[in-house]
Amino acid sequence: MQRSISPNLVGATNNGHENTVMTPCKAIIFDVDGTLSETEEIHRRAFNETFDHFGLDWNWTQDLYRELLLVSGGKERIRHFLDHAGIPRDRFPDELTIVLHAFKTERYVRLLESGQFDLRPGVRELIAAAQRNGYHLAIATTTSRENVECLIAGAFGPDGLDMFASIVCGDDVARKKPAPDVYLRVIERLGIAASDCVAIEDSRNGMLAAKSAGIPVAITPAFYTRGDDFSGADWIFGENGLEASALGLP
């Protein structure tokens, strides 16, 4: 059953169930893009700047990018775009897709390094509360390790990565979300049962990945995912963001 976490429901009950994460909970596993920070718009900008750099007359609007986000992974997103734009693979072989994506990653990292992002409301406080209460922290994402490291270092400083007991990225596994691979790898490394973890996600693909791994999911809808179907989520955060109290953390 889905439990709603929102400003007017925190501490209340929903059909007899409290709207806080039930103990035992030993680990909180975060997605990155859209969850820790509203970075998807920065990704879109980096894609478009990459296309312009290579002389391609492609422009990914917000509406188009919202559709493309249903496909996990940047390289996979480009391939999906090519297929649906009717561009034959012999005209745009996979080697070019890899080159494009590598340049886009470099551009995205430079944008992050220039400070053009903020953590989403409540993220910093939730992480601090989890640390105070002895929870393990981990990351399960389809983005690249370079992107993760840059964002964490920019938000928390050079030692920020040390807060996370495990970080699993899309290139570390065979299948990206909605497959459960990143989550299965995280809980394997943590040595903690899936039922003793909580995943924080912003998208339906992320929710499906965590649920397929047997992990309860709390959703924080983001700019590009507010219209997603989250009917399988265990909890949904409200407008105040990732409130630690909503997860039962003092």
Regions found by a protein language model. Name each.
Residues 135-137:
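A structural preference for short, pocket-lining loop segments at secondary-structure junctions
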Residues 35, 141-143:
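Conserved phosphate-coupling serine/threonine residues in phosphotransfer and NTP-handling enzymes
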Residues 2-17, 21-25, 128, 144-146, ...:
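Asp-based, Mg2+/Mn2+-dependent phosphohydrolase catalytic module
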Residues 91-95, 99, 114-121, 142, ...:
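Residues at secondary-structure transition points
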Residues 21-32, 36-121, 128-133:
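N-terminal helical cap/lid subdomain that shapes the substrate entry/recognition surface
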